[in-house]
Amino acid sequence: MGQSPHLFGAIATDDSTPSSLLSALSGETARLLGRDLRHGDFREGAVVWDAGSDAGQIFFPISGAISIRVPTRNGHGIEVATIGPEGAAGFHDGSGTVPVLTQAVVQAGGRFATIAAEAFHAAASECEELGRLAAVCKAWLLLQSQRTALCNTVHSADARFCRWLLRTSDALGADIVRVTQEAIAEALGIRRTTANLIAQQLQRKGTISCGRGKIAIRDRAGLQSAACDCYSVLGPRHWPCELLRGGGLFRRIDGAVSLNPRI
């Protein structure tokens, strides 16, 4: 599949800055994968794939992030996962023949590396490490989706707002998140007025400061204390880039990836 018409940015065939996930690969594996990687700058709001499409690209965020959403009847989508430089998005059934049920949108614009799914799976057939990369990325998406389902059911909008902001900040590696309160409201499935009220309360406490199209975290400890425990469950030690380096939430059994009961 070619580049989506929704994606903008000049595409180059080489780039010297890898993502956190790509940096976790061995030199030999990185060279194997690098033969087919392309790089581009994608803008916020760009649609990476739509529900019902045969998404055939895998995306490695370098300085941006992708929001994975389940679309609703009114055309909006509820976010179930955020993929930043710690992971990759686009690992579906692998055949390219089964339409995907989610929508992926660039949550934070930036640099991305992409590869055709067919080319990735061809390389993975020669390299066990790439098979593990795909497995931990799928497990990370599943963990986020499961935890988000729980979070949306049992936690308050305030706690979820704080969790979302922290998670996105971690994914981007920055305390300034370029996002509108309207976008957060849509991602969390809450009213815009509710998101505005929560942001105002946090700003009065000095926890965050809000500007046009951006939110800056001023008191991370305070924000963490206000967030639900889903934030710690989805912490950096569970990210695909860390799992490739060894340890973490998942363990490997006969080539498969499963939950590590020791964590």
Q: Which role does the model predict for each range below?
A:
Residues 1-43, 88, 93-95:
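Cyclic nucleotide-binding regulatory module and flanking cytosolic helices
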Residues 25, 61, 83-84, 107, ...:
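A conserved hydrophobic position in a structured secondary element of the catalytic/binding core
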Residues 38-42, 48-51, 167-171:
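Small beta-barrel nucleic-acid-binding modules, principally OB-folds
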Residues 46-108:
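Cyclic nucleotide-binding regulatory domains
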Residues 65, 110-112, 214:
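Structural motif
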Residues 81-139, 143, 147:
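Cyclic-nucleotide recognition modules
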Residues 108-109, 124-191:
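Polybasic "coupling" helices that flank or enter modular domains
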Residues 167-263:
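Phosphate-/nucleic-acid-contacting segments
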